[in-house]
């Protein structure tokens, strides 16, 4: 009776040690936007011990600057619907200080029109384009562009703002070596 419980505990404890699984390169169409692509850092998001996704942050020179173009590459480990992606993003943007209901509704609709449902192994790649907005790609194609600089800044702040809900993931993305679970 105790053996199954110990096995589950062992699996949950061993999971955080697993290597972050992000590709070593960005798709050429994405990298062309930056001209050169160097990884800044990478990390893993866990929620209640479950692996949700691995993420990598890329820039032109391997250093993140909030006012320069960069790429956030997410490789999902779970099924997530378009609605879940949009709702979670809006909840986080709201938590970080945006309360304008009209603006949030517009951004929610834009994400629902851009993001696909994702399955384990799928990539969702976002490009931050200062003063212009954001572009989103899968591993193989452009998904869409949201030409709203404020949306882009607020969306990527979910991961990169110092007030993020996952500071360990932020530290890892910015090149730190902290745990990300």
State the predicted function of each range:
Residues 1-6:
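Bacterial N-terminal signal peptides that target proteins for export
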Residues 13-17:
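N-terminal signal peptide c-region/cleavage motif recognized by signal peptidases
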Residues 19-181:
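Terminal leader/tail segments of proteins
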